[in-house]
Amino acid sequence: MKTISAKPETVKRDWYVIDATDKTLGRLSTEIARRLRGKHKAEYTPHVDTGDYIVVVNAEKVRVTGNKAQDKMYYRHTGYPGGLKEMSFDKLIQHAPERVIETAVKGMMPRNPLGRAMLKKLKVYASAEHPHTAQQPIELKI
């Protein structure tokens, strides 16, 4: 009996919507990363993108524990000398709440072309509205 290996053209991808209201950032991100990679499926194959599409709503209501709201810093560089910018979790959640979840999930994905392709299936929105109703996403409780 041969081992079944998933092929890119035979992979079935579902759409899921996750409400991030009052969810812990790390616990939410690990489940999102797992489903983007397809590790929850029986036909998971490491070299094939078998993951599902994930739509995250209410990103502005995600929580962190302890003092991380003030202490956790996010860094970016403008590309100019001395252009290192930093922003705390509190400020970033007000400025760009989508980036908090995107950054957390990106750190859990493979750092190669396949990981970047998997990350494109993540759609994060600050509020409860999203433009993916035509895909009929299934609500996922985490």
From Swiss-Prot:
An example Pfam family from this entry, by short name, is: Ribosomal_L13
Q: Does the keyword Ribosomal protein apply?
A: yes
* Record-level Gene Ontology MF annotations: mRNA binding; structural constituent of ribosome
- Regions crossing the membrane: none
Which NCBIfam families does the record cross-reference, listed alphabetically? Answer: rplM_bact
Indicate the family of this protein: Belongs to the universal ribosomal protein uL13 family.
State whether it acts alone or in a complex, and with which partners, per the record: Part of the 50S ribosomal subunit.
Query: What protein am I looking at?
Result: Large ribosomal subunit protein uL13
